[in-house]
Amino acid sequence: AVEHLLAAHPDLPLRHSISFLITGDEEGCAEDGTIRILEWCANQGERLDYCLVGEPTSVKRLGDCVKNGRRGSVNGTITVHGRQGHVAYPHLAANPIHLSLPLLEALVQHPFDEKKNTHFPPTSLQLTRIQSGDGSTNVIPAQLTAQFNIRFSTEHTPESLEKRIRSLLNPLLQGDYRYDLAMQVSGLPFLTQGGPLLQAIQTSIAELLNRPPELSTGGGTSDARFISQHCPQTVELGLVGTTMHQVDESAPVDDLTMLAQIYQRIMEKIFLL
């Protein structure tokens, strides 16, 4: 796309620049990839005006969906402490599994959103792991650990979510029994609402594909969650992602060709109009 842009417009003003950010640490903790490059750019005084992220945002056909934002993601671990004992003498123990049931029920049933955010799906808390004991059939375990993930909109912050969770749990676990709560942020929510980049993307898709794209903030997180902290105009547009993370991941060559044309048209609208 950039090659064709420069060939078609050799007199492109030199005040503009185009950079490629390609890293190999996008999955998992994602600590030594995009984050490090963005830190370097900030230290060098580099300013990012627009960022087009090539995530596979298309759902059924190329260009049918554009991600103009993403939900935030926070992982949490709750450890409920009871008292270990023999199952035949429950009065001498405190079963952390029993203690945890009302706590977990309160979490999964809680409506986190007081008002609907029209740009984001509802906040979702999903339990991802529950572990207690070592498999012994005659022992009441000493503790239970439950892990969860929350996907949230710009209506919330990690701090407000932790405060909400503690306000739910504190009344349910009193006396000598206690819980520990640890939360780790894996991404903050962002929203690009209007602006030159989003307008250029929507117009380019409509011109080349004869249909407007849908704007969405659903799905998982991407490196855009890091980039948006440095570049307020961050939007994602890419191929159809039906085979991503699968054996023989693939995309039609025609889609690749058309996507390059869309990217070129977007840059022309940004740089030349």
Question: Where would I find each of the regions flagged by the language model?
Answer:
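Alpha-helical metal-binding/catalytic segments enriched in His/Glu/Asp
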Residues: 1-31, 74-80, 89-111, 148, ...
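Midchain, well-structured core segments that form catalytic/ion-binding scaffolds
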Residues: 41-173, 182, 186-187
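Structural element of the ATP-grasp superfamily
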Residues: 78, 148, 201, 226-227
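Short, solvent-exposed loop/turn segments at secondary-structure boundaries
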Residues: 65, 90-92, 192-194, 247-250
